[in-house]
Each structure stands twice: as C-alpha cells, then as structure tokens.
Amino acid sequence: MAREAHLEAAKHHIEAASKHLAAVGKYNQGDIHGAERHSEEAWVASQVADGKSVEAHRMATMALKMKLV
C-alpha cells in the first residue's frame, strides 16, 4: 500500500514539474500573464504532491512499525 502511495505521489510530482515547465515556456515566449497562471497552477500541484509524499511516508513508517512489533 505504501508503494502505491509513493507511486501516486511521484505521478503528482511529475504533473507539478510539467506545470512548472509550462510556466517557464510561457515566460520565455513573453506571455507574463500565462506564465503567472501556469506558475500558480504549478504551485498548487506541488502542494498536492508534497501532501501525497507525506502520506506515503507515513504509510511506509506505519508498515515498518508493524513489521518490527
């Protein structure tokens, strides 16, 4: 279960990175407003991905504790 949670978190991190790259692309094209919008979306996606990572690590820690008990 923790493994699946880590894979899900990784998927969200890749999505966030893609949004960050889209923001950079818009900025490089001179589209400041588009870059700002993509940057905000990327920030939100990063927060979601970080939350998923925290949950995955919590699951892994609990699984390890159960194994050691």
Kindly give the residue locations of the regions a language model identified.
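A structural motif
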Residues: 7, 67-69
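N-terminal acidic leader/helix
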Residues: 1-26
